[in-house]
């Protein structure tokens, strides 16, 4: 459940969703935070949830959002995407997302943003697949921690383990 979405991937998905479903005037909510409770969020007619929920309670979240009439577009595990006995719709992509914790998960999306009058229940999107693949190929900037002079982290000290024996004081 600790699969946090890389910002570049989230931004690509959010832009695609806003453009595809004409959501420019909607407030985007991200209620799934560590230690948070998504049910305590304030959902209004002009809000839409675009987020990556905990996959362990994914089906429960879908059922709650449908019951509460919350607009949503949720990241979901592709292998267990479908939620039976719901009016949920799906966007299927051919992409594996590498999440912040290093997990690589074949991902698709569950939504209720597709107009029921359209009769469409599933969208298969090469466009969204390509956008996600493109941003994942871009080198990600890694924040470098500047340590004070004379301080070391364990990764720096590992280099010495292969070349000799050392004992450090302090």
Model-derived features: positions:
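Class I S-adenosyl-L-methionine-dependent methyltransferase catalytic core
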Residues: 1-48, 54-170
